[in-house]
C-alpha cells in the first residue's frame, strides 16, 4: 500500500437534514419503468485508481462526458483527487436514491466512495457543479474501526430512512470474521453496525434488499488478507474465500438462512434482485465457478437457488492453469427486468440474456471486447479437436482493447452499455499487467432491446492511459441521476 500523504484539506457543508420517506417529489423515480423514460445520460462519474500501480498519486473521481452532441464527448472533463494516497477507490453509491422517492426533503447529492484498502469513506458533492464534483467530507477509518471493528468497506446502498448502509469485508487485520455492515446517518456520521450481534456474515462483499419481502441477501468474496495480495487458488482450498449467501431479515438484521452454493458458487460477488419490488427472485454471479445463479423464495418463506447459466472453462495453452474460467465479475439487470448482462473478465466477452422467464435465460447477444484469448495473445484456447483458437477483438479509434471487460453500466432506456476493464489493482497486476503500464479504458456498446444483440460504438473510447499523472485504472461508473445498480425500489 502506498504511503498515506494528505494532499487536500476536506471541506464541510450542510446536508440539509435528509430523513425518511413520507411524500412524493424525492430523488429518483416512482417505479423502475418510470426510470426507463428518464433523460439520457450526459455524464458518468468513474472511480480511477493509482493505488497499486506504482504511481504515487491519490486516486480520483473522473467525470466523463457521454453526450454525443457535446464537443468534449468521450473524454474526461474533470478529475477530483482524494485527500490521501493509497485508498483504492472501488465501488460507489448514493446518499439517497429511488428508495427515498417519496420524500421531497431528500436530495441525491452525495456520491459515496468507500476506499477498499485504506478504509476511508468519501462523500462527494455532485449537486453544486455536476461537471466538477467537490469533496464534502470523509469518514475516518480509525473511527470506523474503533466504533464498530469494521474495515475494508465495499458496497454502499442508500436506505429509505435517509441512512447509508456499507458492507465491510473484514477487520483491521484483514480477517474475514470481522466483517459486517456499517450504518451511517444522513450526514455520514457513524451510527453502529447494522446487523444484530452474532449475525455477521461469514464473508462480505455485495448486498441487495427487497423490503416487500422483508429480506436482504449478501454475498461472499473472501478474507482481505488473501484477496488484497492477488489471487491464489490455494487460498480457496484453505477456506479464505466464500461460497455462501446470507439471507437477512429486513430491516431486522438477523440471519434467517445461510445458503451454501458449494462448488457451483465459488466467490459469489455481485447480487441483484429483479427491480420490480414485488418480485421474490434475483441473481448472483459466481466469479470462480463462472455461473449465474438464480435465487428465489419458497412458499414456506425459505430461499432456494439454482444455476441457470453456466460458462464452461476453456482448455488453454501458455497460461498458469490448464483450464481458464470465464470469471464473472459483474452483471446487471435492465430496469424492465427483461435482460441480464454479464462479463467474463478472463475470457473477454460480454453477454446479453433474455430473462423474461428467469428460470430459463436465453442468450441474445455476445461480443468480445478484450480478454486473455484475443488474437495476438500468447494464450490460446484448445478445442475438442485439439486445434487452438483465439477470439477476434476489434480496435476502437485505432486503439487495441486491453484487459478484459469488468464493471458495466446500462443507460436508463437500456440501449447503451458502458464497460471498464479494471477489477482490483492487485488482480489487474497479476492477470493483465499491460493495463498497469498502459492504463484502462471505457468503451460503449449499443444494445438491441427488441431482438437482442450487442454492437461496439466506434466513436466512444475513453483512454485512461492518457491521464495527466500517468495511466490509471478505471472501475465503477455512476450517472448523476441514478442507474440500475444503484437504485432500489420499495
UniProtKB/Swiss-Prot annotation:
Q: A single GO BP annotation from the record? A: cellular response to selenium ion
For this protein, the record's InterPro entries field holds:
Se-bd
* Molecular function, one GO term: selenium binding
Positions modified as N-acetylalanine?
2
Which keywords belong to this entry? Acetylation, Selenium
> What triggers its expression?
Induced by cadmium (at protein level). Induced by selenium (selenate), copper and hydrogen peroxide H(2)O(2) (at protein level). The induction in response to sulfur starvation is repressed by glutathione (GSH) (at protein level).
Which tissues is this protein detected in according to the database? Expressed in seedlings, roots, leaves, stems and flowers.
Q: Where does selenite bind?
A: 21-22
Pfam families with a match to the protein in the record: SBP56
Q: Which superkingdom heads the taxonomic lineage of this protein's source?
A: Eukaryota
Write out the GO cellular component annotations. Answer: cytosol; plasmodesma
Q: Which family does it belong to?
A: Belongs to the selenium-binding protein family.
Q: How does it assemble?
A: Interacts with GRXS14 and GRXS16. Interacts with DALL3.
Its function, per the record, reads: Binds cadmium and mediates lower sensitivity to stress requiring glutathione (GSH) for tolerance (e.g. cadmium, selenate, and hydrogen peroxide excess). Probably helps to detoxify cadmium potentially through direct binding. Binds selenium, cadmium, zinc and nickel in vitro.
Q: What is this protein called?
A: Selenium-binding protein 1
Amino acid at each position: 500500500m502506498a504511503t498515506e500523504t494528505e494532499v487536500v484539506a476536506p471541506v464541510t457543508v450542510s446536508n440539509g437534514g435528509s430523513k425518511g420517506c413520507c411524500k412524493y417529489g424525492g430523488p429518483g423515480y416512482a417505479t423502475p419503468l418510470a426510470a426507463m423514460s428518464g433523460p439520457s445520460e450526459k455524464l458518468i462519474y468513474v472511480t480511477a485508481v493509482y493505488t497499486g500501480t506504482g504511481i504515487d498519486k491519490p486516486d480520483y473521481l473522473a467525470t466523463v462526458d457521454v453526450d454525443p452532441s457535446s464537443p468534449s464527448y468521450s473524454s474526461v472533463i474533470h478529475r477530483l483527487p482524494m485527500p490521501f494516497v493509497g485508498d483504492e477507490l472501488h465501488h460507489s453509491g448514493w446518499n439517497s436514491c429511488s428508495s427515498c422517492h417519496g420524500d421531497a426533503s431528500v436530495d441525491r447529492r452525495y456520491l459515496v466512495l468507500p476506499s477498499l484498502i485504506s478504509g476511508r469513506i468519501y462523500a462527494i458533492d455532485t449537486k453544486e457543479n455536476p461537471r466538477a464534483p467537490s469533496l464534502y467530507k470523509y469518514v475516518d477509518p480509525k473511527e470506523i474501526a474503533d466504533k464498530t471493528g469494521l474495515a475494508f468497506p465495499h458496497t454502499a446502498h442508500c436506505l429509505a430512512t435517509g441512512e447509508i448502509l456499507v458492507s465491510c469485508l473484514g477487520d483491521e487485520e484483514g480477517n474475514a470474521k470481522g466483517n459486517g455492515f456499517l450504518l451511517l446517518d444522513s450526514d455520514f456520521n457513524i451510527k453502529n453496525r447494522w446487523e444484530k450481534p452474532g449475525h455477521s456474515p461469514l464473508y462480505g462483499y455485495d448486498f441487495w434488499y427487497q423490503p416487500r419481502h422483508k429480506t436482504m441477501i449478501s454475498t461472499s468474496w473472501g478474507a482481505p488478507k488473501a484477496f488484497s495480495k492477488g489471487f491464489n487458488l490455494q487460498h480457496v482450498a484453505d477456506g479464505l474465500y466464500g461460497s455462501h449467501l446470507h439471507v437477512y431479515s429486513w430491516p431486522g438484521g438477523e440471519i434467517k438462512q445461510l445458503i451454501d452454493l458449494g462448488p457451483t458458487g465459488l466467490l459469489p460477488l455481485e447480487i441483484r434482485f429483479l427491480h420490480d419490488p414485488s418480485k421474490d427472485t434475483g441473481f448472483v454471479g459466481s466469479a470462480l465457478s463462472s455461473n449465474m445463479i438464480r435465487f428465489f423464495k419458497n412458499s414456506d418463506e425459505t430461499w432456494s437457488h439454482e444455476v441457470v447459466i453456466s460458462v464452461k472453462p476453456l482448455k488453454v495453452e501458455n497460461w498458469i492453469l490448464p483450464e481458464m474460467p470465464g470469471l464473472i465479475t459483474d452483471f446487471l439487470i435492465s430496469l424492465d427486468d427483461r435482460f441480464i448482462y454479464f462479463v467474463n473478465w478472463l475470457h473477454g466477452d460480454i453477454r446479453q440474456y433474455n430473462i423474461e422467464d428467469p428460470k430459463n435465460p436465453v442468450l441474445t447477444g455476445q461480443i468480445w471486447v478484450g480478454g486473455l484469448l484475443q488474437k495476438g495473445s500468447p494464450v490460446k484456447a484448445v478445442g475438442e479437436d485439439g486445434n487452438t483458437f483465439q477470439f477476434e477483438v476489434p480496435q476502437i479509434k485505432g486503439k487495441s482493447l486491453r484487459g478484459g471487460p469488468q464493471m458495466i453500466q446500462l443507460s436508463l432506456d437500456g440501449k447503451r452499455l458502458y464497460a471498464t476493464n479494471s477489477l482490483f489493482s492487485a488482480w489487474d497486476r497479476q492477470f493483465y499487467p499491460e493495463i498497469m503500464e498502459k492504463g484502462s479504458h471505457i468503451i460503449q456498446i449499443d444494445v438491441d432491446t427488441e431482438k437482442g444483440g450487442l454492437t461496439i460504438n466506434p466513436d466512444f473510447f475513453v483512454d485512461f492511459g492518457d491521464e495527466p499523472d500517468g495511466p490509471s485504472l478505471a472501475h465503477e461508473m455512476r450517472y448523476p441521476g441514478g442507474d440500475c445498480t444503484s437504485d432500489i425500489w420499495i
